[in-house]
A protein has these predicted regions:
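Secondary-structure edge/capping motif, primarily at the C-terminal ends of alpha-helices
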Residues: 82, 111-119, 180-184
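Helix-turn-helix
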Residues: 2, 9, 20, 24, ...
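All-alpha amphipathic helical-bundle segments outside canonical DNA-binding/catalytic cores
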Residues: 90-94, 126-132, 147-170, 191-195
Length: 213
């Protein structure tokens, strides 16, 4: 006798619906920005009524917080794996840069603008903490290891401390993320990301001045 297919329980259906909302919200927020997206629009794309949407999230800001928090958590796991590699500082920073550029399928500056100006202070403070823990802490660990191993100069030698260096790295990288070639093929995009990662790290570690001597 054939086994009957197990029917999903209410909790599973609820979680599936929640993930659908987050997936759709990510696409809309990262394409149009926080202000331009409405809960009515979100509900329609998800095939829900607005009251049904509010069953899962209290308001648009709570949805945005959940979307960005999930993205930061995913990126943090990947960065931690790169940190644990036995490569040089330059190699690991290039790996970080290449990975982050490949994940920036949305306008990073748009997201940073939304976090700074469109959400409440409470939500902004939460995301600032998550950004520091998810992005900056693992990247700073690479710089700190480089200082400890003698690959990088410390502050007393004219270098930078690990955390300021990590923030500088992210600032430089965001500039490359906003200059992706228009109508690029997947192969072109991959080549651009690899070249940009190498250029970003090379300039960060060695500067743009001609060497003397």
């Amino acid at each position: 006798m054939a086994r009957r297919k197990r029917q999903p329980v209410a909790g599973e259906i609820a979680e599936e619906t929640r993930q659908t909302i987050l997936r759709v919200a990510e696409q809309l927020f990262m394409t149009y920005g926080y202000r331009a997206v409405t809960t009515r629009q979100l509900a329609e794309v998800c095939g829900l009524t607005q009251p049904a949407l509010y069953h899962y999230f209290a308001d648009k800001e709570e949805i945005y917080l959940a979307v960005v928090s999930e993205e930061i958590a995913k990126i943090h796991l990947a960065l931690e794996r790169i940190v644990r590699r036995a490569d040089t500082v330059s190699e690991r920073l290039q790996a970080v840069a290449g990975f982050l550029l490949s994940r920036m399928h949305y306008d990073l500056n748009l997201m940073l603008h939304d976090v700074r100006y469109e959400v409440s202070t409470k939500t902004r403070d939460k995301l600032d903490i998550q950004f520091r823990q998810g992005f900056i802490v693992p990247i700073a660990a690479i710089f700190e290891q480089g200082i400890q191993r003698g690959e990088l100069r410390d502050v007393t030698q004219g270098g930078m401390a690990a955390f300021p260096a990590a923030y500088l790295f992210m600032t430089m990288l965001s500039g490359f993320a906003t200059r992706v070639p228009l109508n690029a093929t997947p192969r072109d995009l991959q080549a651009y990301q690899a070249a940009s990662a190498e250029t970003c790290v090379r300039i960060l570690l060695h500067g743009i001045a001609r060497s003397h001597g």
